[in-house]
Amino acid sequence: MTKLSDKKYWDSHYDQKSSSSESNSNEISHPKKSIDDKLRNTLFRGYADYLLWEKIFPKYLNKKKLKVVEIGSAPGKELVRLHEVFDLEPYGIEYSESGVKLNQRNFVENGINPENVIHADFLSEEIAKKYESSFDIVMSRGFIEHFDNPEEIVKKHINLLKKGGILIISIPNLRGFNYIMQRFFDNHVIQIHNLNIMDKAEFEKLFDDERLSVSFCNYYGTLNFNLFAAKKKTIGYFLLLFFKILQLPFNALFRIVFGKHGAESKIFSPYLIYIGVRT
């Protein structure tokens, strides 16, 4: 299996997040004080986030106390949120050492056992055997698109699911308008993503497995500048900061105009998501 990004990249990525979180109480290791949380009960909340947590997840995550594991779990914010909102028991599998430490710190600060963060390579045979059919929910966000053979990665997700368990996989959509924008801000980000699966038809094919029954598969959200990344201390970085501020009134506008109906499109939607059940 060929990874489009390596361990060194992710160690560096989470080292930066970890160091900034230690010096700034509003950063990612303090989710209860984050800017995202402060906006969560306002119209300025991210529209894709609103659709996911107020429309999509409540429909399919309607049982409590289920064991959920996230593949590539650092920094652990989403697992903490799933625990708080849906009363799920969170676990994470993370192979970056700095990512594991950040995830564990987030768990500790939110009363979750840090030993639930598993420091291992998800692709290893050890993980496949030890955790086969162990979880009620297996999820990953922005993970499978970093491989050139994502269908094999999906199979490894399924392997960890109990029968009747729920598979949730989401990826960014870096095609259409989003491709143009991300290429402008930092083309390296494009290079470490598998763009072929960022099309609904191709994405759906990844889950053509007799062990799965599809519940939902689609784009979600609309224009979202928070999808993009730029190298620090560049013109693009400061320009992107401006666009992210501009995003706030757009979020309010989308909520008012579209509500929970959404405005999905292959051109502007920032994400695709699959939800299915292991039969």
Residue ranges of model-derived segments:
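Short alpha-helix
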Residues: L195-R211
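Conserved N-terminal segment of class I S-adenosyl-L-methionine
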Residues: M1-S133, I137, R141, V154, ...
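A short His-aromatic
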Residues: G142-H146
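Short conserved AdoMet
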Residues: H83, D148, K162, D208
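A short glycine-rich, Lys/Arg-flanked "PGG" loop and its adjoining helix->strand segment in the class I
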Residues: E151-K163
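A C-terminal cap/extension of S-adenosyl-L-methionine-dependent methyltransferases
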Residues: Q182-R183, F216-T279
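Short, glycine-/aromatic-enriched active-site segment of Class I SAM-dependent methyltransferases
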Residues: S170-N196
